[in-house]
Amino acid sequence: LKDTLALRHTITGFYDKDNYIHDVLTQSLLLQAEAAFFQYQNQFGANALMMLSLAENESALGRSYLAYTRNNLFGHAAYDSSRYASTSGSVYSHALHYLSNAYMNPSQFQFHGGFFGNKAGGMNVSYASDPYWGEKAAQYFYEMDHAMGDRDHNRYALGIVKNTGVSIYKNADKKSDA
């Protein structure tokens, strides 16, 4: 999947952006998972900043009840008996099972685009009932990338086409070359 999406990430560490993330994380369980975000980005092709943004959204910046009592940063399978051994385990499960094998895998029914999205496209079609879930997660992503100098913002144009009869254009313009 990593090669399929041709992901190349320019953000390589949490301290790329002054102390913003450090200030947020020192009071949350997200700090314990720092290395896991990058390890599983490289292992499974799931963007670390995207996973962190989603974890911030789903776990109240790593301070939610599920984060503290279950090491669960994403709210997945949050049953009384279900607990991750560590926050890294939560990131592993999210990167492998939810992103790489489902929501970011074009051959799976959950795939509607490799972005947070809304109810028309992206992960939010199947992931969350809140129609604004994608906007909330994307806001965390945008704020962190902006604080790091907008190194990922508008850097890539990715597309996955399963039908060979679809025209692909260089720009979002009627006059663009195919």
Segments the model singles out, each with a brief description of its role:
Residues 1-50, 61-178:
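Catalytic cores of secreted/periplasmic lytic hydrolases that degrade extracellular macromolecules
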Residues 53:
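C-type cytochrome heme c attachment motif
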Residues 58:
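Pyridoxal 5′-phosphate
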